[in-house]
């Protein structure tokens, strides 16, 4: 989160790049959209949420904290940039990973810093409409004049957010969506939201149609004696996006307290998009009881990030919100090698055969609305046949439980 004092170059041919103080102006929206009402769980999205890994979140936070600091004016920030970009490049489901360059125009700081990182997953039917989620990867501690030697681990602020965006990309990149998704890591947030501001302004200049921006910044601290909860920060003009987000929270975690609130100090990257005319919101750990250790050498795992289960919950909800708004479509999930299965013919018409090396326990077929079409409970058989003669043409997800685990396959009915 921005403190109180306030490489391919520019992806200008379709992907472009606000930050400032606490007072957020409500710029008119550049585009208007209808937002889905989320009243029931999508089983595919629920399965993805369940796949968010605490171990993975902890490993990401631990690695980011291993740098001396991630200050945007230090030499270490370039190593962090390269590590994050390489990580996104390792995901086969992403189409492009870009470095977005920008200039720092702030007294007392060098003009050059590390880049924003943009990992792009193009939409199938509405590639010109964008759903963006992002987290800043720089950290801050101003207790010394030397930016290269000061210790600023930045666990809660904001390794937790970076870990949540990574989990979202890691899991959603296995699927196809109607709209384009951009997973972002911002630089120079801590000195005035500079990286995200540059990008959001360029997006507005290019008339990019951003349907919604979801921010992740500080979600790992929970005050002793309180239950996991969420404060959602947004301006009233963005209430349609917020209503959808609240739907996601109440549908998937109905017992979790979640409400609108406003930060008494500081700001975060969602404001960049709001000021540039895009709907945006910021889920936050607690505006009145956030980590007291941020911007110090004590912002570490265990002390400042004291509840990884809460970080997991925030990542799950971010994933679900992005997936619902982007629109799940053609499903392409890599099955576990431990669950060797075949679905054929595919595409199918009148019937489909399912063959497994291990015995099948249950076969369930869902359409892309998440509706259960058919379930068959089996007793260790290696093969079953499903009559698909009455299935409408389209794409389906076959969920297979075998004696050796669970697998998912895409099925096309002609």
Model-derived regions: residue spans:
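A non-catalytic alpha/beta surface segment that caps or lines the substrate-entry region
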Residues: 56-122
């Amino acid at each position: 989160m921005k403190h109180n004092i306030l490489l391919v170059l520019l992806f200008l041919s379709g992907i472009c790049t606000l930050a400032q103080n606490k007072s957020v102006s409500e710029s008119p929206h550049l585009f208007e959209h209808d937002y889905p009402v989320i009243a029931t769980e999508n089983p595919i999205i629920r399965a993805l949420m369940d796949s968010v890994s605490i171990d993975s979140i902890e490993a990401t936070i631990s690695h980011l904290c291993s740098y001396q600091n991630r200050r945007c004016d230090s030499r270490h920030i370039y190593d962090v940039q390269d590590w994050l970009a390489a990580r996104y490049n390792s995901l086969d489901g992403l189409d492009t990973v870009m470095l977005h360059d920008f200039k720092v125009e702030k007294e007392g700081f060098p003009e050059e810093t590390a880049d924003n990182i943009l990992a792009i997953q193009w939409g199938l039917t509405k590639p010109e409409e964008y759903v963006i989620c992002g987290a800043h990867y720089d950290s801050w501690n101003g207790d010394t004049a030397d930016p290269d030697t000061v210790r600023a681990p930045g666990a809660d602020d904001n390794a937790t957010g970076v870990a949540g965006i990574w989990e979202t990309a890691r899991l959603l990149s296995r699927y196809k969506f109607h709209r384009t998704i951009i997973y972002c890591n911002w630089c120079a947030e801590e000195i005035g939201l500079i990286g995200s501001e540059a990008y959001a302004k360029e997006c507005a200049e290019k008339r990019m149609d951003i349907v919604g921006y979801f921010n992740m910044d500080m979600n790992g601290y929970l005050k002793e004696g309180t239950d996991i909860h969420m404060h959602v920060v947004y301006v009233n003009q963005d209430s349609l996006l917020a209503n959808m987000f609240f739907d996601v929270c109440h549908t998937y975690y109905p017992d979790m307290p979640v409400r609108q609130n406003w930060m008494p100090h500081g700001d975060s990257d969602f404001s960049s998009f709001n000021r540039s005319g895009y709907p945006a919101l910021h889920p936050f750990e607690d505006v009145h009881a956030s980590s007291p250790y941020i911007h110090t050498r004590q912002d570490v795992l265990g002390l400042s990030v004291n509840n990884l289960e809460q970080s997991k919950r925030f990542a799950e909800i971010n994933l679900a919100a992005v997936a619902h708004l982007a629109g799940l479509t053609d499903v392409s999930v890599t099955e576990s090698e431990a669950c060797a299965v075949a679905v054929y013919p595919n595409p199918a018409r009148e019937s489909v055969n399912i063959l497994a090396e291990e015995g099948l326990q249950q076969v369930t077929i869902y359409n892309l609305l998440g509706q259960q079409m058919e379930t068959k409970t089996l007793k260790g058989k290696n093969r079953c046949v499903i009559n698909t003669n009455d299935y409408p043409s389209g794409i389906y997800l076959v969920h297979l439980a075998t004696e050796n685990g669970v697998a998912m396959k895409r099925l096309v009915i002609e």
